[in-house]
Amino acid sequence: MLSIANKVIVKHAVTKIRYGDVLLTYGSSLAVEMILLHAHELGKQFRVVIVDSRPKLRGQQLLRRLVEKGLNCTYTHINAVSYIMHEVSRVFLGAESILSNGTVYSRVGTASVAMVAHASRVPVIVCCEAYKFHERVQLDSICSNELGDPDAISSVQGRVDVNHLDGWSDIENLQLLNLIYDAMPSDYVSMIVTDYGMVPPTSVPVIVREYGREQVWL
C-alpha cells in the first residue's frame, strides 16, 4: 500500500519539475528522493540543492545516492540556506505528519527552510502520504515533541578539539535541548502532494475525514 501511495505522489509531483529548475530539499525524504530520481529518468535537466543539519546529517545519505545515479547536486548546511535560496526555483520537502490545521510536522529545521523560501517567494511543495495525515491540531513544536539525546549536540563527531561542552551534565544551571521535530505553519506551504492528488493545506481536513472513512470500510 505504501509503495502505491508513493508511486501516485511521484506521478503528480514530477509534473512540477521543469527544465533548468534548481530544486532544494532538506535532510532525506523517501518520497522526495523517488520524485527526483524519476524526474532524472525522464530526462529532465535540473539541479538539486540538499540542505542538511547536525547532528544526524541525513542529507549526506541522500546526496550519496543521488550522485551515484548521476544527478547534479549541491550540498550545504542549514546556516547557509538564506544565501542559496536565491538560486532555487522550488522547494520539495517530506513530512512525518500533516495535522488537520495544515501544520506540517517534520524533522527539526524544516520550518526554518520553509520560512526562508516563503520570504524569498519560492514555492514550497510538501510530499506526504495520506496515512500520515492526522486529525490532531498543533500550533507549535513545544506543546508536543520528541527529545533526542542531548549528548548528540554537545560535540562534533571526529573533532576532539571541539570540547567546550564536556561535562555539561554536571552544570546545574545548563540544559541541552535536542528537539527531533518542528511544526511548519500552513502559511509556508504552497501545495501538498499526496496520493489523493495535489491539494492546498486548507484541504487537509477533507482528506483526514475521507481517509478515515476508507479505513472504516476496509
Annotated model-derived regions:
Residues I17-D21, L42-R47:
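Short, surface-exposed connector motifs at secondary-structure boundaries
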Residues M1-L2, L24, R54, A80:
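Short amphipathic alpha-helical molecular recognition features
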Residues M34, A39-Q45, V51-L218:
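Conserved phosphate- and dinucleotide-binding cores of soluble alpha/beta proteins
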Residues K16-L24, I84-V88:
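Intrinsically disordered, low-complexity regulatory regions enriched in Ser/Pro/Gly/Thr
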Residues M1-I4, Y26, S144-P150:
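Non-catalytic, soluble scaffold/interaction modules
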Residues V22-E33, P55:
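Gly/Ser/Thr-rich loops at beta-strand to alpha-helix junctions
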